[in-house]
Amino acid sequence: MAQIDFRKKINWHRRYRSPQGVKTEHEILRIFESDRGRIINSPAIRRLQQKTQVFPLERNAAVRTRLTHSMEVQQVGRYIAKEILSRLKELKLLEAYGLDELTGPFESIVEMSCLMHDIGNPPFGHFGEAAINDWFRQRLYPEDAESQPLTDDRCSVAALRLRDGEEPLNELRRKIRQDLCHFEGNAQGIRLVHTLMRMNLTWAQVGGILKYTRPAWWRGETPETHHYLMKKPGYYLSEEAYIARLRKELNLALYSRFPLTWIMEAADDISYCVADLEDAVEKRIFTVEQLYHHLHEAWGQHEKGSLFSLVVENAWEKSRSNSLSRSTEDQFFMYLRVNTLNKLVPYAAQRFIDNLPAIFAGTFNHALLEDASECSDLLKLYKNVAVKHVFSHPDVEQLELQGYRVISGLLEIYRPLLSLSLSDFTELVEKERVKRFPIESRLFHKLSTRHRLAYVEAVSKLPSDSPEFPLWEYYYRCRLLQDYISGMTDLYAWDEYRRLMAVEQ
């Protein structure tokens, strides 16, 4: 196992215009302060205020959005990071681990990773993801890319259909089809930060949001040693070269994770579990008393000193005494949140320290709060009650189905841009209006300038005389559409769908 030295991981250099001659702790901290400014002031962070956490298109400002959720995750991440550093200081290990002059950057990377962790999520959350992937699967049929004979291939895109005698090109076609049918919020976050927003963050800061290490074009089983880390796609084919450079800069082996990402993940797990239940009470899906009974029933028999007793029962008893002259529900969630944090944060911090050799190497194949402990059971309890009583509620399910329909409908509306031939689409990009394509011209004008420029830049770097050019061009055209639609807020997507379907004046 390699020696633990965080000076080899907290890399403050950038992809472009990297600072030179940096020597002191203060100078390094200023670089990460610059990262904070770039992130907090980015439009992608602002758009989170109109993206779903659990309840789409919610008008009640007390119910969480992706932005308020991310701010809560940021605070919990800061708490865990400080707890880890405090414990390492008590053990006199800060200097041994190269952290004695990097405590500020350590905390800042964790905080900003938490704030950005949902930055790539599409409108309507997981149902938006599912809509994008289902729509592309119904046209690209990635499973047919393994088919024999090749005539069984149902792919509706000529450039990506498998052809006899073109094996090197067929392998690229397989990768592209698989990649486009595995849109994922975390992978889109990497694309957003590097390719679309060009935020030019430090290598360490980007490493903090690379939650999953599986390429989106991966086919087949993942290695058992990295099964958890490769649970979902973490980056796209379009960012393959950037991620290869990132791994080199952060000394990460293939499919390994950046150490501070485990802290961000734990902060997210702790935050959303309690928050989802609180939002459900705010939405009157159930009362606080009903929630307590749901939790009590799901946990089952327990001793007086059990974690359930110390966290949930304690919160319930204190809220009923109403000593602070506040509503029972306000008090219950205040105590539940405090009790949960006071138990889970120290536990997550100690798990990080206990498993630091594997975490530093990037190979710890678990989440910090997924084990056989009572702390893990408490999180599962919150999640299971939310799944059973919140996510399955008719109002929630109806909104999710509407969200799925909106995203599917928008993709269908913009489909003419994907139906154009390579030469016709190239002409449209160059002229921006082509008389014989009135619909396509108007759809193209609606696309964001940022996304169009990303497409143009990517295609301009391709050798136009290569046999691979039509494949890559179509790939980036699909990315253009995915970028545009996934970047919408819930409300904008809803309004745009209604306008283009002519269902309102």
Swiss-Prot record:
EC number(s) on record? Answer: 3.1.5.1
Per the record, the GO terms for biological process are: dGTP catabolic process
- UniProt entry keywords in alphabetical sequence: Hydrolase, Magnesium
Q: Which Gene3D superfamilies match?
A: Hypothetical protein af1432 (1.10.3210.10), putative deoxyguanosinetriphosphate triphosphohydrolase like domain (1.10.3410.10)
Magnesium listed as a keyword: yes
Q: Which SMART domains match?
A: HDc
Family that this chain belongs to: Belongs to the dGTPase family. Type 1 subfamily.
Q: What is this protein called?
A: Deoxyguanosinetriphosphate triphosphohydrolase
Q: What is the lineage of its organism?
A: Bacteria, Pseudomonadati, Pseudomonadota, Gammaproteobacteria, Enterobacterales
What is the primary gene name for this protein? Answer: dgt
